[in-house]
Amino acid sequence: NGAGKTTFFNVLSGFVRPAAGSVRAFGVDLLSMAHFRRARWGLRRTFQTEQAIEELSVFDNVAMVHEHSRQGGSRRGDVLDAIAFAGLDADPEASVRTLGAGQRRLVEVARAVVGRPRVVLLDEPAAGLPDEETSHLAEVIRRIPEHTGALAILVDHDMSLVSACCTTTAVLDFGKLIASGPTAAVLRDDAVIRAYLGVA
């Protein structure tokens, strides 16, 4: 905690403006866009706390985000595809309030991948989930780039989840980048081990 992970996401998604520097993705300056334009451009985000609306159905929760889709297409088809991709076995018309914690997290992922996003930001998506549900979620996250063509960025302090999902890893320690590169190499880095375990 305190490494700067959520602040990094807040800058990318437009909730925090940095004092200096730039943020570019796919050749586009994200800082020049209002946060709602970033959504239209194709930036999606999950949060540490659920954002799904309990009173609405699974379908309607995902469909709300489809309004920011960067491509045309069948709204219903796109929404059902996102729900299926996330591996949600709930009835799309079921109220979100009837779902367990793991299924709710999958609703968040479906909201993040609907409408062919360019960048998907996942903020501690497995927090509080048991191992079995975390394993399923990790498999879904791993498939996001292939399924959507999007760049998926995961922030988490669960190194087993990072290892399972990420080919490239960057490590922040109190706001400073201390290592980046292939995940396996980064997780063996002495500076990373010291920062996370206090030993080298």
Which ranges hold each PLM region?
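Glycine-rich phosphate-binding loops of nucleotide-dependent enzymes
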Residues: 1-200
